[in-house]
Amino acid sequence: MYVHEVTFDGRVRRDLVASLRLQPYAEKVVLPHERTHRGPKEDRLALLRATRVSLEPLWFLYEGADTGIPEVVERVAARAPAVAFTGPEGTEHRLWVISDPAIHATVNATLAGLQVLIADGHHRYETALAYAEEVGGDPDAPSRFTLALLTDLADPGLVVLPTHRVLKAGVAVTGGEPRGSLEETLASLRGRVAAGTYRNHQFQVLPLEGEVALVELHDQVIDNILGKRNPEEFLLYTRDPGQAVRWVDEGVGSAAFFLDAPDLRQVLKLAREGKTLPQKATYFHPKPPSGMVFDRLERDRRL
């Protein structure tokens, strides 16, 4: 068990790193919020079979109030770290080892009943479930757990960014509010259920009915345009709104759609209701680096 701290862009985020018991989604303990595809899971399952090691933590969010976990994280982080390093993106990481059995017992008891939201790693989580069923073993076998990075939903350093869409299919968007620039368009999305659009060198803001802009954009606009066609064949994704504009200007796509960052409380609410969002609904930044911590899926496995 570890505490991880990352410093980036003037922010600090602290996480707990631990083994989390794998549970089917039907148990309503681990909550997904995005749909997955078969291809990526097949690749990840092959990697697990070959290595029998979790090489990077999956990222989960939890509501820390009244759990005591954020307080444990803060106490541990008050001392000198065991490891400090700079990641490839210039982010600064620090890692503390939690070796106190009393803390282990307290945190394990809390995690046993804690509902968590998958932030990043839907494909890997479902792969880990498949691997656990494949290898079998007793209920407490290492393969029945996954390496988890757990972040309090209220952590001030938690950053989620929107992913913008560029549609390659022909499209006509009407009923929008004209805007003079990309910056003005993005500013107009804050606090609204709306999407920005760019087509034929013109920006618009498209008001949408509903609670979550991304869901309504797909339900009311993109799905109507594509019909029964696979959206993954006609959509491009980028976190850079300027890139989306360039793709349209260069003829790579016919229209760009811009979104504001999602409200994580709304995402959690939908996940608790059993509803999933379209692909690439969220982008959490920065992600935990691969290889920071390993977790053996066999007790006698040597690294």
What are the residue ranges of the model-derived segments?
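Surface-exposed, charge/polar-rich loops and edge strands
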Residues: 1-303
